[in-house]
Swiss-Prot record:
Family: Belongs to the MORF4 family-associated protein family.
Gene inactivation effect: Male mice are viable, fertile and show normal T-cell function.
Annotated region described as Disordered, given as residue ranges: 76-99
Disulfide bond residue pairs: none
Any one GO CC term of the record: perinuclear region of cytoplasm
Record's subcellular location: Nucleus; Cytoplasm, Perinuclear region
Transmembrane segments: none
Sorted UniProt keywords: Coiled coil, Cytoplasm, Nucleus
Annotated tissue distribution: Widely expressed in all tissues examined and as early as 7 days during embryonic development.
Coiled-coil blocks: 94-124
PANTHER family according to UniProt: MORF4 FAMILY-ASSOCIATED PROTEIN 1 (PTHR31324:SF1), MORF4 FAMILY-ASSOCIATED PROTEIN 1-RELATED (PTHR31324)
Name of the protein this chain belongs to: MORF4 family-associated protein 1
Length: 125
């Protein structure tokens, strides 16, 4: 570091001093408007987030209903196929395979229902 000269210490920088009204209009007013816009933007975003989450949950609920409907239709189709082929006959490997598939689909649907319930519970907390 170099030592300061006495001349440098004696001459302070000149700073333009504004009237309070000019200062307010030039510097504070734009900042206040910008802050208001930011607050309004954050408020709008905060309002949209729950709506988006509700939309996602509604979409997931519809998917679960479709899956459940498909599982029930598959089970019914498998049962109708077995009854049409003669329910008194011993069950063949195709019937057992159809039952296994129906059970797997039912398990998947139940797991999806549990997942949605956990998501709903975590979002409501």
């Amino acid at each position: 570091m170099r030592p300061l000269d006495a001349v440098e210490l004696a001459e302070p920088e000149e700073v333009e001093v504004l009237e309070p009204e000019e200062d307010f209009e030039q510097f504070l007013l734009p900042v206040i408007h910008e802050m208001r816009e930011d607050i309004a933007s954050l408020t709008r975003e905060r309002g949209r987030a729950p709506a988006r989450n509700r939309g996602k949950l509604w979409e997931m609920d519809n998917m679960l209903i479709q899956i459940k409907t498909q599982v029930e239709a598959s089970e019914e189709s498998a049962l109708n196929h077995l009854q049409g082929a003669g329910g008194a006959e011993p069950r063949g490997p195709r019937a057992e395979k159809a039952d296994e598939k129906a059970q797997e689909m039912a398990k998947m649907a139940e797991m999806l229902v549990q997942l949605v319930r956990r998501i709903e519970k975590s979002e409501s907390s």
